Amino acid sequence: AESGCALWVYEAGSGIRTAISLGELSDGSISLFFGDLSGKVYSINPNTGQKNWAIQGDDHDHARITGTPVYYDNRLYVPLSSLEEVAGAMPDYECCTFRGGLLSVDAQTGETIWKTYTVAEPTKQGKNKLGVQIWAPNGAAIWTAPTLDPETRTIYAVTGDSYSHPAAPESDAVMAFDMDTGDIKW
């Protein structure tokens, strides 16, 4: 660090748009956390650049992590987003089935503690002019880092737009989640 030279480089599987969070784990070690454009979440050793773990935040083909994961008390809170809206602009694409969400992960192991979606499971809503299925509700991705209030055990997150009609009331909204269970408070 004194020389200004890079000590290590980590090659993630996809582009990175999040900032990096740093946290002290329950075993006393330090870890760096970030997400990538393939929807993966990473824990990296800051001294060696070695991967501690990597998980897929969501299994949807268009899932992305664009908001910075937030570390608190050996938990990582990860906002879930997507680029399905871009695919949905194609008239032959069945738009859209991605649902935004928030993921709680054990920062030491990468194991999922809970995952909460911002909208209900999409259902068939009719067809477009080409006869291609349209689904809703969808979207309401969480694009940015959530805000934690440890005193009230609440996580606040802002959601993006719905990808098709009818729009979900949870889209373009501020939502509150229980830090311990992931339950939606409002």
Regions found by a protein language model. Give the residues of each.
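Inter-blade boundary loops/turns of WD-repeat beta-propellers
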Residues: 1-2, 25, 46, 107, ...
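Glycine-rich active-site/cofactor-binding loop and its immediate structural neighborhood
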Residues: 1-7, 35, 43-44
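Aromatic (tryptophan-biased) beta-strands that constitute blades/sheets of beta-rich domains
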Residues: 3-12, 50-59, 111-135, 183-186
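Repeat-blade elements of multi-bladed beta-propeller folds
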Residues: 13-41, 64-94, 99-102, 133-167, ...
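Accessory beta-strand-rich segments of carbohydrate-active enzymes
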Residues: 39-40, 45, 49-51
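Beta-propeller blade signature
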Residues: 44-45, 97-111, 170-183
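A generic secondary-structure signal for well-formed alpha-helical elements
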Residues: 48, 80, 84, 106-109, ...
